[in-house]
């Protein structure tokens, strides 16, 4: 008797506890005032059930109330199971609608969990059902099965036959036809108004759904890294060299978020366009970058890659894009990359790169912050490993900004005792702003005639260092600095902003010095960065190109220019404004990078900080012998007369001719040609055209006789 009396009390206690739990669960979805437990319950429900978390919490609340206030079995078992099935169909359809394209299983579950927390999709439970359904029967088959089972569960819950419902609706429609014309018109008007209201409500719901942002966790991580890096700067204040404050550089602007629906629509357009040309392929992954979005495409068996590559223009037309670049295949993947420009380019600021953990932890003092790749990862290059860099790009493509980013990266990474720079700027206006910083070895060289002398000094410094290494029994600058820490040698970075201007003034000397430095200077700690806006073969000669394997190409005007700099096409498809192809030494294919941007105001702020806090100490570099070509008469070559005899006999003058006939090296033959030009015997350098003999034979003989006297 006592047990029977206590049974209702126990059930009531269980019911109250159940009601309290469901009430907390229900409120945790709408408010943050439920504490730590409520917060975790809400995250769990959203992560596992997505938008269905609101439905299941409401159902549990109703069940708790019915369990507490009714003494009978309030719902039959088959209806309970049907209700559960209907709920699973709801979250599965929701998941399938928002995320139909499958990725890696773990990535798909991870995205579903994060999206569920942000009230999108069907959470982990919905993603599990959808993943296996799509794998088995595809997207269309999944929709058919889910809708069919939804109808079955509705029938089980309501006990209403769908067939009888359709028949009764048809009978009512027949009866309605018998009504008078006046009533028909009124009914039609009423239906139209109702449809307008319904369509308006549907539009509002769609807009609300589209406004839901997909969470990007990278933003929070970047902010944390910035705080850490600012602390790192503060810790260095007591040392000999303090890099400029990071606050001198502009902060990054939050990137505009592209809706998943837009990306899925573009993926479908790509598949449809290829299908129209008889190519079956499927987009398996979409990667959004700062400037472009890459669609990874897997063609069906038997489809040639060249067929897809040939449809570049057709894909651009279908997607209404200014240009489309195809990477076939993507290195390390069995997929083809279709790179489509974003409607809005997200600028990558240099602060975002320098302020990153990757740049801060980079061990080399010659670290260069280039920008971000397609996946949004920060790209850092090591100039010490390149060991030289060739940069080319048309006007306005971002070449000068890249050079500024490179220089400022070195200023933040290395002290003047570690790295010194020689800046050669024939254009005068680009690099002059850096005069006075402590990292400069000599003031910015703006005279093209003096530039050859500076390069000659670099060659002599390289030879001196190799002699020093030989005397001390070491192989390179790293070994020397490690062994003799008190006599450390600084590394030298030579930056030439416009190579074509130097090649026009003294091509033979400049080519020879660059050739020698590119071949031998790496171990001596001397590195070249050469930039040009005219990547033609008379500027980037075969000798220079063969000895500088690392290259960066910005947007160029033609495929020929792209082949000249990269040995392949593709640079003509770039967007400009910092869009580059980075081809480091050892890479199988170039990496597409959105270059880091730094404004003139930021450069000026960094330079002013260094000028105010540090004094510049220039080394004396003697360049008199190379600044005036007329001094060549003072060191006339012994074989000059023999060279004159050769050109008079053959009727032509060239370096290669003197090399063959006189059996001398390139440098000596080039020097003799320069001396003949200064004496007015032969014409000057004119690109690919051969030099002409200007003076008649008699005048030449008089000059030589005068010299012998």
From Swiss-Prot:
Mind naming one GO cellular-component term on file for this protein? plasma membrane
- List residues binding ATP: 396-401
Arranged from A to Z, the UniProt key words for this protein are:
ATP-binding, Cell cycle, Cell division, Cell membrane, Chromosome partition, DNA-binding, Membrane, Nucleotide-binding, Transmembrane, Transmembrane helix
BP-aspect Gene Ontology terms: cell division; chromosome segregation
What subunit structure does UniProt give?
Homohexamer. Forms a ring that surrounds DNA.
As for family, the record states: Belongs to the FtsK/SpoIIIE/SftA family.
Q: What is this protein called?
A: DNA translocase FtsK
- Protein species of origin: Caldanaerobacter subterraneus subsp. tengcongensis (strain DSM 15242 / JCM 11007 / NBRC 100824 / MB4)
């Amino acid at each position: 008797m006592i047990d029977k009396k206590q049974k209702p009390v126990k059930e009531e206690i269980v019911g109250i506890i159940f009601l309290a739990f469901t009430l907390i669960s229900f409120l945790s979805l709408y408010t943050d005032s439920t504490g730590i437990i409520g917060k975790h319950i809400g995250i769990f429900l959203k992560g596992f059930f997505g938008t269905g978390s609101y439905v299941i919490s409401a159902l549990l609340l109703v069940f708790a109330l019915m369990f507490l206030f009714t003494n009978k079995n309030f719902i039959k078992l088959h209806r309970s199971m049907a209700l559960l099935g209907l709920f699973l169909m709801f979250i599965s359809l929701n998941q399938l609608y928002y995320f139909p394209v499958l990725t890696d299983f773990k990535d798909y579950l991870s995205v579903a969990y994060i999206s569920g927390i942000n009230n999108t999709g069907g959470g982990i439970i919905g993603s599990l059902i959808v993943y296996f359904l799509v794998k088995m029967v595809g997207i269309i088959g999944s929709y058919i099965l889910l809708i069919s089972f939804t109808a079955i569960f509705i029938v089980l819950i309501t006990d209403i036959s769908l067939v009888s419902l359709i028949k009764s609706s048809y009978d009512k429609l027949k009866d309605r036809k018998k009504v008078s014309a006046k009533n028909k018109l009124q009914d039609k008007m009423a239906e139209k108004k109702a449809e307008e209201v319904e369509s308006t409500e549907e539009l509002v719901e769609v807009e609300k759904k589209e406004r839901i942002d997909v969470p990007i966790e990278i933003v929070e991580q970047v902010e944390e890294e910035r705080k850490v890096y600012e602390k790192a700067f503060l810790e260095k204040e007591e040392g000999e060299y303090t890099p400029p404050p990071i606050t001198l550089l502009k902060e990054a602007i939050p990137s505009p978020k592209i809706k998943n629906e837009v990306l899925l629509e573009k993926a479908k357009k790509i598949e449809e366009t290829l299908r129209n040309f008889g190519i079956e392929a499927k987009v398996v992954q979409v990667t959004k970058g700062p400037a472009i979005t890459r669609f990874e495409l897997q063609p069906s068996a038997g489809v040639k890659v060249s067929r897809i590559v040939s449809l570049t223009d057709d894909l651009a037309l279908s997607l209404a894009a200014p240009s489309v670049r195809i990477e076939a295949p993507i290195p390390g993947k069995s997929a083809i990359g279709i790179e489509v420009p974003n409607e809005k380019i997200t600028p990558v600021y240099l602060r975002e790169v320098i302020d990153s953990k990757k740049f801060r932890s980079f061990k080399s003092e010659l670290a260069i912050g280039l920008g971000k790749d397609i996946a949004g990862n920060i790209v850092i290059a090591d100039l010490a490993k390149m060991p030289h860099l060739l940069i080319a790009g048309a006007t306005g493509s971002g070449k000068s900004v890249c050079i500024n980013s490179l220089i400022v990266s070195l200023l933040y990474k290395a002290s003047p005792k570690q790295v010194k720079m020689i800046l050669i700027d024939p254009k005068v206006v680009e690099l002059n702003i850096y005069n006075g910083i402590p990292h400069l070895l000599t003031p910015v060289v703006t005279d093209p005639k003096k530039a050859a002398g500076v390069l000659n000094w670099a060659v002599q410094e390289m030879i001196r260092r190799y002699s020093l290494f030989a005397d001390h029994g070491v192989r390179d600058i790293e070994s020397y600095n490690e062994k003799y820490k008190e006599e450390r040698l600084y590394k030298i970075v030579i930056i030439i902003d416009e190579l074509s201007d130097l090649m026009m003034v003294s091509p033979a000397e400049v080519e020879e010095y660059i050739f020698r430095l590119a071949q031998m200077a790496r171990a001596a700690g001397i590195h070249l960065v050469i930039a040009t806006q005219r990547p033609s073969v008379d500027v980037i000669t075969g000798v220079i190109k063969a000895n500088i394997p690392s290259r960066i190409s910005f947007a160029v005007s033609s495929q020929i220019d792209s082949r000249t700099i990269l040995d392949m096409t593709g640079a003509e498809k770039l967007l400009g404004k910092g869009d580059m192809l980075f081809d480091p030494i050892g890479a199988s294919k170039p990496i597409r990078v959105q270059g880091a941007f730094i404004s003139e105001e930021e450069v000026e702020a960094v330079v002013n900080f260094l000028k105010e806090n540090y004094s510049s100490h220039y080394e004396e570099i003697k360049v008199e012998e190379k600044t005036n070509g007329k001094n060549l008469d003072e060191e006339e070559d012994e074989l000059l007369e023999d060279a004159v005899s050769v050109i008079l006999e053959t009727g032509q003058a060239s370096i290669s001719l003197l090399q063959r006939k006189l059996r001398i090296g390139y440098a000596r033959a080039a020097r003799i040609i320069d001396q003949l030009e200064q004496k007015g015997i032969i014409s000057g350098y004119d690109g690919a055209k051969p030099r002409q003999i200007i003076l008649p034979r008699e005048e030449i003989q008089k000059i030589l006789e005068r010299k012998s006297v």
